[in-house]
C-alpha cells in the first residue's frame, strides 16, 4: 500500500516539474561535455600543428598557463623560483 502512495506522489505536478528540471540539467551537462570534448580535440590539433611548424609544445603550454595567471601571482612564482634556483646554484 505504501507503493501506491508513492506512485501518487510521483504523478504530482511538483514531482513532474522536478523530474523535467533534472532531465533538462542532465541533458545540458551532457551537451556541454560533448562540446568540451570537441574543443579539447581542436586544441590538441592546434598543438600538433604548432609542433609540425617547429614550435616547442611544452613552451607553448607554459606560456598559456602563465597568461592565465594574475600578473602578481606570476611575479611571485617567478621570484620564488629564482630564489630556489639561486640557493641550488643553478643561476
UniProtKB/Swiss-Prot annotation:
UniProt xrefs under InterPro entries: GapR-like (IPR018753), GapR-like_DNA-bd (IPR046367)
Q: What is the official name of this protein in its record?
A: UPF0335 protein BBta_6866
Q: Which GO terms describe its molecular function?
A: DNA binding
Task: Describe the family membership recorded for this protein in Swiss-Prot or TrEMBL.
Answer: Belongs to the UPF0335 family.
Amino acid at each position: 500500500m505504501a507503493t501506491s502512495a508513492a506512485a501518487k506522489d510521483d504523478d504530482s505536478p511538483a514531482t513532474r516539474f522536478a523530474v523535467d528540471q533534472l532531465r533538462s540539467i542532465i541533458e545540458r551537462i551532457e551537451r556541454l561535455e560533448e562540446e568540451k570534448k570537441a574543443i579539447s580535440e581542436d586544441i590538441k590539433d592546434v598543438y600538433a600543428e604548432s609542433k609540425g611548424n617547429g614550435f616547442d609544445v611544452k613552451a607553448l603550454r607554459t606560456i598559456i598557463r602563465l597568461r592565465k595567471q594574475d600578473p602578481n601571482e606570476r611575479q611571485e612564482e617567478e621570484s620564488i623560483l629564482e630564489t630556489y634556483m639561486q640557493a641550488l646554484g643553478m643561476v
